[in-house]
Amino acid sequence: PATKAGLRVYANDLNPHCARYLRENAAANRVKNLVKCYNLDARAFVRALLAPGPGPTVEEPDVPAEPESGGSEKSAGKRERKPAPKPPVRWAAMTPEEDEGAPPAGAVFDHVTMNLPASAIEFLDVFKGAFDRATWGDRKLPTIHCYTFKRADETKDDVIKRGEGHLGARMASPRVREVRDVAPNKIMLCLSFTLDPEVAFGEDDGEKRATDGGESKRPRTER
């Protein structure tokens, strides 16, 4: 669905057969140029994407064109206001062989979908302190969508607390959405939250919030 909207996707699966079929499905649906597929451990995959990059990030800003020599001042002014073609970026330059190796360092993205409900929540710790401030700057940090299960006797707040335990920090305005019943007394949920800068960049305030007692107020969760 993301690629149908023209979004670029970094995808990963530890199972090599799943990764192969992921590539084949992307090609069959004619979105291969928008999907980069990897066969790595989930933590290694995320850390590789978040490592400081050697150059510009995947998204390049428009660069004003330089006026050409000669011609009138009026025509030169028009050329100055016209954006120059974007230079090639790492995404476009990646080959299928590079898909097989390490993901590009210095990538930026808006959403993370962790769609293995049996264990995804256990990997939330990988995001804490993993972001490079020079790469992200003032850019909005990504929203995490983590699928998980809950028992019938658990509340949504219980799921949030479990997620915060694995993240190692409090979540800002977490939202919990019921997906479907999978068995008697077992419900699949999606826990969504946007990373705080203190957590993403590993600043001291994030540590304080993680070890804060139960007196602090939790934002109201979405029911």
Regions from the language model: what does each represent?
Residues 3, 49-50, 131:
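Hydrophobic residues in alpha-helical segments
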Residues 8, 34, 143:
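Residues at the starts of beta-strands that form the adenosine-phosphate
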Residues 12, 38-40, 114-117, 147:
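Generic beta-strand/beta-sheet core signal
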Residues 12-107:
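S-adenosyl-L-methionine
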Residues 1-9, 125:
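Conserved SAM-binding loop of SAM-dependent methyltransferases across substrates and taxa
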Residues 66-110, 117-223:
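C-terminal catalytic and target-recognition region of SAM-dependent MTase-like enzymes
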